[in-house]
Amino acid sequence: MDISISWVVIIVFVLSYLILMDKWRASKLPGNLPPSPPKLPVIGHLHLLRGGLPQHVLRGITQKYGAVAHLQLGEVHSVVLSSAESTKQAMKVLDPTFADRFDSIGSQIMWYNNDDMIFSRYNDHWRQIRKICVSELLSPRNVRSFGFIRQDEMARLIRVFESSEGAAINASEEISKMSCAIVCRAAFGSVLKDQGKLADLVKEALSMASGFELADLYPSSWLLNLLCFNKYRLQRMRGRLDNILDGFLEEHKVKKSGEFGGEDIIDVLYRMQKDTEMKAPITNNGIKGFIFDVFSAGTETSATTIQWALSELMKNPEKMVKAQAEVREKLKGKTNPDVADVQELKYLHSVVKETLRLHPPFPLIPRLCKEECEVTGYTIPAKTRILVNVWSIGRDPAYWKDPDTFNPDRFDEVSRDVIGNDFELIPFGAGRRVCPGLHFGLANVEVPLAQLLYHFDYKLPSAMTAADMDMSETPGLSGPRKNPLIMIPTIHNPTS
């Protein structure tokens, strides 16, 4: 009995302490915060995040409480931005204030203590690595020069589809392999030996990094950090990642050259690592973090977008017919179409934009407010975590008619681009931290998609109809399909 009473006393003491600390923190906040749902002691609004994907749940909250909403998640204060107006103010007007990232256990472990480009803080290291990435890999000139790689890997994919004619094929798997090969050859000069294992690690890491980890939401609690079992799982994954990347980098050091006959971006990073005048030294972990960036942002997002585009076209057969008619007319007689050729495909561009509207590669964009400021009349305290709900903005009826309907024709009436100029449609982000690889990514979506539509007609397996298609998403930073896309390709014969 004495033991039971002791435990009750301890629990009451701990809860009382946590509640008092919660009230003390709340007293330090400014009075003009964004609207907020009712919260519970200690956990704040954590209970509201149950029962769905984060972007879906957060959309429901902002629909009820306003496009700018304040949430207390454990000890951490967050603000959700779900309108084009608030996002424009944060990412354009106040861009330097919101250009930072916040730390998480997942990014610290898998992205080498954020010594990469995607999760790096807004500092000299980030500016330096981004500049190298854009100039050496992602410039429009380089994107065009990678045309022969896209053509080569597309030819492989077409052969795979041809060999499966009349039979069901896992299109998701084959498209991912193609995307992976294009990125590896363009960035590193060759296909990685353990490319498949690395791709699996990327999917697993992106899935785990997309959720809310309790240890991240209670940073002062050493106990939750100790009991964070996902941390130990991530550390094991990091060990596997190190084995793959260390082996690749050792091979890279002894090889003479890649397929371009000169330096690739890894060579450039190694050369600059020796430069003593660099503002921020480039470490070996920084190079590995960059490689993981290229894989996670370059392969998974492009492959996912192609899969969603094909899924939406299969779900909407009349749109499929229109897209195929345009592609087959404009590309007729062109054996190896690339970026310049697909520029003529107006409806295909609309299909891709509509896909990115409904299925953005980054449904939630994380930022950190560096200093206290004001957004749409509300005070945002310094160090507040920001979540830009790109998925919700793309489905907002204030900007889009019939927002949940796949309708590429809407872009005949509404002129909006996807490169960060129009804040109603920002699948690649905006401002200083807009995705540097967006032109590379778009080329790796549009060219393969055009060829898949040109060469094949498609059916669903068994007795499935378009209405039966599962369009569910699964947790992940890139918003992937819950289930793989299974299709039956039939070779298109223009003379039939």
Swiss-Prot record:
The monoterpenic phenol thymol is widely used as a fragrance and a flavoring ingredient in food and cosmetic industries. Its derivatives have also several biological and pharmacological properties such as antimicrobial, antioxidant, anticarcinogenesis, anti-inflammatory and antispasmodic activities. Medical applications include the treatment of disorders affecting the respiratory, nervous, and cardiovascular systems. It may also act as a growth enhancer and immunomodulator. Pfam families: p450 (PF00067). It catalyses: (4R)-limonene + reduced [NADPH--hemoprotein reductase] + O2 = (1R,5S)-carveol + oxidized [NADPH--hemoprotein reductase] + H2O + H(+); (4S)-limonene + reduced [NADPH--hemoprotein reductase] + O2 = (1S,5R)-carveol + oxidized [NADPH--hemoprotein reductase] + H2O + H(+); gamma-terpinene + 2 reduced [NADPH--hemoprotein reductase] + 2 O2 = carvacrol + 2 oxidized [NADPH--hemoprotein reductase] + 3 H2O + 2 H(+). InterPro entries: CYP450_71D, Cyt_P450, Cyt_P450_CS, Cyt_P450_E_grp-I, Cyt_P450_sf. It is found in: Membrane. GO terms for cellular component: membrane. It is an enzyme of class 1 (oxidoreductase). Induction: Induced by jasmonic acid (MeJA), salicylic acid (SA) and UV-C irradiation. Changing residue 386 to T: In strain: cv. Tc. Heme binds at residue 435. Changing residue 156 to C: In strain: cv. Tc. GO terms for molecular function: heme binding; iron ion binding; monooxygenase activity; oxidoreductase activity, acting on paired donors, with incorporation or reduction of molecular oxygen. Optimum pH is 6.4-6.8. Keywords: Heme, Iron, Membrane, Metal-binding, Monooxygenase, Oxidoreductase, Signal-anchor, Transmembrane, Transmembrane helix. Involved in the biosynthesis of phenolic monoterpenes natural products thymol and carvacrol which have a broad range of biological activities acting as antimicrobial compounds, insecticides, antioxidants and pharmaceutical agents. Catalyzes the C2-hydroxylation of gamma-terpinene to produce carvacrol. Mediates also the C6-hydroxylation of (4S)-limonene and (4R)-limonene to form carveol. This is Cytochrome P450 71D180.
